[in-house]
A protein has these predicted regions:
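N-terminal amphipathic/hydrophobic targeting modules at extreme N-termini
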Residues: 10, 14-15, 20-21, 31-33, ...
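N-terminal small/polar loop signature for handling phosphorylated ligands or for N-terminal nucleophile
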Residues: 136-199, 296-352
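Gly/Ser/Thr-enriched, mixed-charge loops and adjacent short helices
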Residues: 83-92, 200-327, 332-333
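Conserved phosphate/anionic-ligand binding catalytic regions in large, soluble enzymes, centered on
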Residues: 90-108, 278-286, 438-443, 448-456, ...
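Phosphate-binding and adjacent anionic-ligand microenvironments
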Residues: 334, 338-340, 361, 381, ...
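An N-terminal, well-structured beta->alpha segment
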Residues: 60-152, 159, 245-272, 282
Length: 602
């Protein structure tokens, strides 16, 4: 019984008078339970929930009183009752990818107060890590990105942390480069990538330009939680402290472009025509400026989509994985007889491509196919190097691994999340040459002067590749077919299942438990060779009946290996979703993949 009394006290402690009242109310209930035989444990729990509801109402009222100062009153007023309630009944958590969420009131939403809380926790973390910390802050074109950047800068400056803040939006890869180039302690990118317009987020980077490691993220999270109630934060702004906020040197952007120019060298002259769209994001003006500096002018912008717009007004989807993101680019390509279509997501860390043939037929490429093409080109470009290495995520295609093996290129597989790729790059020996890294979710890196996905450096690289092919009367589609002929037609697909509520959570857990406790001998006629469990860091070889260790951080992922490829199951840590990845080299791939999906989720 003491636990529930203590729970009441903890729930109420931020409101002192309420805490005292509810604490003694809990004591009263506790005594009543002992003295009154008819007074049940369930009554106590019910009353506890009622009191928690009262507290939630008090909490909501306090937030509404501060709505005018929150920066998000407009967003809150546009939300449904359920969405509003979620903001008060949940809490934003700082995870391995930082924080991402909707605008609104409450600790479960992004607003002035929750941003101040995050910034204060981060300031304490940085000051605990080193003397005189420095940081670069970049932000994208989303609603409140610039305002959040200024709030964070003010809080950090108030704690004597030197902040470099640009006067305009920037791309995510530029942030990674800036941290490394300017030798700062940390970096912050304010973005929500391709999420809807009412989302934003904050990603934190370490001194190597990579997103924080799991351990560092957990430590930052504890510092943020220790701040307490965001409505109680008082951040005095003084002229002396704001002197810690410095203008971001424009020379850093110039250096970033020079690195890409040196990587590309030149783009061969051909009659290749390109259509490019930034999907209202940050890659314009830097990408057009970069292409022109490389003397490539044969491109047309989707003008309506190349203007920064936090509402993403002219796109159905700002996600390069979604073919709808290309709709206006396709129209322009038909009009101009273009060969290659390229789009980047709003923070320019991911990229999608499509090609148009002489008959006007559009072919879209998935992330694994783009990865295979880029790896193939990098293998051609680096033939003079020894000890070449390619890095990819564990759910990316076997196609690229086969291509690497065929060309005597070493490969490594890491957990999903580009910070794990960055970690591998950091661990490289001097003699190793990392020539390419990617994730199937359309994130690519050719040269590791950046330690995150970088669509900006990939745009001129893919154009150079396509331009070379055009000189020989070939296309990227032809080149992919040649890769298939060389190493086999590995094909890939992804099934994403949303399973809401308690029953959905039970089903997800049951699926994962079944594969762990009773692994199948075969799936749709494919003989299972091994089961890799990244939660236990073990791999079970079915044919040998042996278990060995996986040298990897823990993650709730299961991968089933066949001679023909693999399938992988990966539940989301933040949403009621589970993803099934299928990567196989077999006849009737689409039919087999659909049957595997039906078997697992029926």
């Amino acid at each position: 019984m003491h636990f529930h009394t203590h729970l009441l006290y903890n729930t109420c402690e931020k409101y002192c008078l309420g805490a005292v009242f509810f604490y003694f109310w809990g004591v009263f209930l506790y005594n009543s339970l002992h003295k009154c035989k008819g007074f049940s444990f369930h009554v106590l729990l019910s009353l506890t929930e009622i009191l928690k509801g009262c507290l939630a109402t008090m909490n909501k009222e306090l937030w509404i009183e501060r709505a005018n100062d929150s920066l998000v009153k407009h967003f809150y007023e546009q939300q449904s009752d359920i969405e509003q309630r979620e903001g008060f009944e949940s809490k934003l958590t700082f995870g391995t990818a930082g924080i991402r969420g909707k605008f609104g009131l409450g600790e479960g939403r992004l607003n002035k107060f929750t941003i101040e809380k995050l910034a204060l926790g981060l300031a304490r973390y940085l000051n605990a890590q080193t003397n005189n910390p420095t940081i670069v802050i970049h932000y994208d074109i989303r609603h409140l990105s610039a305002e959040f950047a200024q709030i964070i800068a003010n809080v950090l400056a108030n704690h004597q942390i030197t902040v470099y803040l640009p006067d305009t939006y920037k791309t995510t890869p530029e942030l990674s480069f800036a941290v490394r180039n300017h030798n700062t302690t940390s970096g912050i990118m304010i973005t929500a990538s391709h999420n809807p317009k009412d989302y934003n987020g904050i990603k934190v980077y370490g001194s190597d330009g990579a997103q924080l490691s799991t351990d560092a993220s957990e430590l930052v999270s504890r510092y943020i939680e220790d701040v307490g109630d965001p409505l109680q934060i008082d951040i005095p702004i003084s002229k002396q402290n704001t002197s810690y906020i410095k203008p971001f040197p424009k020379s850093v952007t110039d250096d970033y472009m020079k690195h890409i120019q040196n990587m590309i060298g030149y783009i061969p002259k051909s009659d290749l025509q390109v259509v490019f769209t930034s999907l209202h994001g940050t890659s314009v003006p830097i990408v057009p400026k970069l292409l022109k500096s490389l003397n490539f002018n044969q491109f047309n912008l989707v003008e309506a989509q190349c203007k920064p717009d936090p509402n993403f007004s002219s796109v159905q989807s700002a996600n390069p994985e979604d073919h709808r993101a290309f709709d206006q680019a396709v129209e322009l390509a038909h009009k101009n007889d273009a060969d290659l279509l390229i789009c980047t997501d709003p923070d320019a860390d991911r990229l999608g491509i499509a090609v148009r043939d002489v008959h006007g037929q559009i072919t879209y490429f998935n992330g694994n196919q783009i990865g295979a093409l880029l790896l193939n080109y990098r293998i051609q470009q680096t033939s003079q190097l020894r000890h070449r290495l390619m890095i990819q995520s564990i759910v990316s295609s076997d196609l690229t691994k086969s291509l690497a093996r065929y060309n005597n290129v070493e490969y490594k597989e890491v957990l999903t999340g580009f910070k794990f790729i960055a970690h591998e790059i950091r661990q490289l020996d001097d003699y190793q040459n990392m020539i390419f890294a990617f994730e199937e979710s359309y994130g690519f890196l050719s040269d590791p002067f950046v330690r995150d996905k970088d669509a900006v450096q990939i745009v001129p690289l893919i154009i150079k590749y396509a331009s070379e092919l055009k000189l020989y009367g070939k296309t990227l589609k032809d080149e992919l077919e040649q890769i298939y002929q060389t190493v086999g037609r590995h094909e890939d697909t992804l099934f994403s299942h949303t399973l809401e509520g308690l029953e959905g959570k039970k089903k997800i857990n049951a699926i994962m438990t079944k594969f762990r406790s009773n692994p199948p001998q075969e799936i749709q006629g494919l003989k299972v060779k091994a089961i890799e469990d990244y939660l236990t860091s073990e791999v079970y070889q079915l044919d040998k009946d042996t278990t060995s260790q996986i040298n990897s951080p823990k993650s709730n992922v299961i991968r089933v290996l066949f001679d023909e490829g693999f399938i992988a199951l990966r539940p989301s840590g933040t949403e009621p979703k589970i993803k099934l990845y299928v990567s196989l080299k077999c006849p009737n791939f689409d039919d087999v993949a659909q049957k595997i999906n039906a078997m697992i989720f029926s």
